[in-house]
Amino acid sequence: MNGRFGKFGGQYVPETLMNAINELEVEFNKAINDEKFMMEYKYYLEKYVGRETPLYFAENMTKNLGGAKIYLKREDLNHTGSHKLNNALGQVLLAKRMGKKRVIAETGAGQHGVATATAAALFGLECEVFMGAEDVERQALNVFRMKILGAKVNSVKSGTNTLKDAINAAMRDWVTNIDNTYYVIGSVMGPHPYPTIVKDFQKIIGEEARKQILKAEGRLPDYVVACVGGGSNSMGIFYPFIKDEGVKLIGVEAAGLGIDTPMHAATLTKGSVGIIHGMMTYVLQDEDGQITPAYSVSAGLDYPGVGPQHSYLKEKERASYEAVTDKEALKAFLYLSEKEGIIPALESSHAVAYAMKLAPSLSKDEIVIINLSGRGDKDVNTVMKNMEENKNGK
């Protein structure tokens, strides 16, 4: 593990963090090669998270769109309502193994914060979550969930008051409390070894989906579609298909109010190579290399960077990345709810929206898998507000 995907990745961190990061790499490698650790992890995935999650044939949607067969990988059915617990559980288990008494995490939509607080409660560790002040407001329900689970939530008032600033605050805390604290990063980002750790704990999604589609259809899918913020749900489903050249991988970013406006989070579509949060990757930045704010209706996608392995897949042309606007995502949110009785997270709705455009252009014997990364309970308020604003002609 040299921590590079082509030129992307690396460890752009202060000297004070290098020891902790090196220790983490050593301990992680020991853990994943330790049968006892992996058995314990798999036990909790099955009995606590509720894996495996179904691969569901979306018959109504398929008929209605009149093209490819659409399958949904139901990560929304995991305990805590998204794919996030796959990773939080693995990392908190690792923290416990390393003898750390306290875990910290950053969170945007609040899903990773809830997942980390959940795992910390399960394994008896102290938990503190950093969240941008704006996200605290947007995701009040998740903030309360974290507090119920015994976590302390810090509202971060700096920069844009969103995920990027929460990560900065969490990294500062980690530097200060390195001896007793483990930093649970929520996506395939940050300095090496984090992108690999998170990918290894999320690839269960794609491993299951690959087996399930072979069982259901006797062959691999033509397309796998997933939303991309930092990129962990997408990397989790993409990774086991990377070697299958016939499977097209499509990551869907947030186009916000449009990629030709400054109000979007389409890092791979509109960004350029730079350094953020300890890694070299695509970032949204100005001519001077200053990070520009990311925006999306979905709190989980408004990140101005992206996991380095996604940057690598883009450059190698192994995956392609598209962008979907707030409006299209909101439409897809309602569409899936009405057609299949499944309320998706606004993040996942971006993937659904792209698949709604893709499927009708394909033949009836082609297969599309959408990673439904989370459920939409947390977003009902946001959607309600948007519908009211549209009614009032805003």
Swiss-Prot record:
Gene designation: trpB
Give the CDD domains listed for this entry.
Trp-synth_B (cd06446)
Pathway it works in: Amino-acid biosynthesis; L-tryptophan biosynthesis; L-tryptophan from chorismate: step 5/5
Cross-referenced HAMAP family: Trp_synth_beta (MF_00133)
Organism in which the protein naturally occurs? Clostridium acetobutylicum (strain ATCC 824 / DSM 792 / JCM 1419 / IAM 19013 / LMG 5710 / NBRC 13948 / NRRL B-527 / VKM B-1787 / 2291 / W)
Q: Which Gene3D superfamilies match?
A: 3.40.50.1100
Q: Where is the signal peptide?
A: none
A single Gene Ontology CC annotation of this entry is: cytoplasm
- Name any one Pfam family assigned in the record: PALP
Q: Name one GO molecular function term.
A: tryptophan synthase activity
To which protein family does this belong? Belongs to the TrpB family.
Q: Which InterPro entries match?
A: Trp_synth_b_CS, Trp_synth_beta, Trp_synth_beta/beta-like, TrpB-like_PALP, TrpB-like_PALP_sf
Q: Which reaction does it catalyse?
A: (1S,2R)-1-C-(indol-3-yl)glycerol 3-phosphate + L-serine = D-glyceraldehyde 3-phosphate + L-tryptophan + H2O
Q: Which PROSITE patterns match?
A: TRP_SYNTHASE_BETA
N6-(pyridoxal phosphate)lysine-modified residues are 84
Disulfide cross-links: none
Q: What is its biological role?
A: The beta subunit is responsible for the synthesis of L-tryptophan from indole and L-serine.
For activity, the cofactor(s) needed are: pyridoxal 5'-phosphate
Please indicate which superkingdom the organism of origin belongs to.
Bacteria
Task: Please identify the protein, giving its name as recorded.
Answer: Tryptophan synthase beta chain
